[in-house]
Amino acid sequence: PDQSTHDWMQDQGMQTHFMAEIERYGFDKVMDTAIDQALQAGAEHLYISLDVDVIDPAFAPGTGTPEPAGLTPREGFPMLRRLAHEVGIVGAEIVEVNPFVDPGYTTALVANRCLIEMITGVAMRKAGLPGPHYLDPGRAGDRWYQTP
C-alpha cells in the first residue's frame, strides 16, 4: 500500500507483512510471526479478505491490478489452509476477480482452490488434527521416506 494507507492501517492496529520479510526470513517464519501476532492480540477467529492480485499474474491474470512477482499457489494455498487451521476463521472473501480479462478462466480456478483450502483448514481444526504444517501421512510419502 502507499504510505498514507499503510499509516492508516497501523493506526487501526492492523499487522502488515511485506515480501521483503519473506525474502529475508522465509515464508514459514513470517507465517509463524503473523499467526503469533494474531493469537497474542487475542484473536479467537479471523475474517480473511483475500485480494486475488496478491497471486502472481502467471496464475491469476484476471484481476484489475495484476502484481508481478506475487505469491504462487504453492505459497498461497498452504498459507490459507494454515490460517484456517491454526487460528480459525469466521468468514472469508476473495475480491478483485475479473473473469472478463481472463479468457482461460485461470483466476476463477485459483480463487476456487483458495476457498477449498480455507474450508479444508476449518475441517482440520474441527477434526482436531495436529498443528502447523500437517500433511496427511498417506499422501506425504511417509511409507517411502523417513520423517524426522
Identify the role of each PLM range.
Residues 1-148:
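Conserved alpha-helical scaffold segments that buttress catalytic/binding sites
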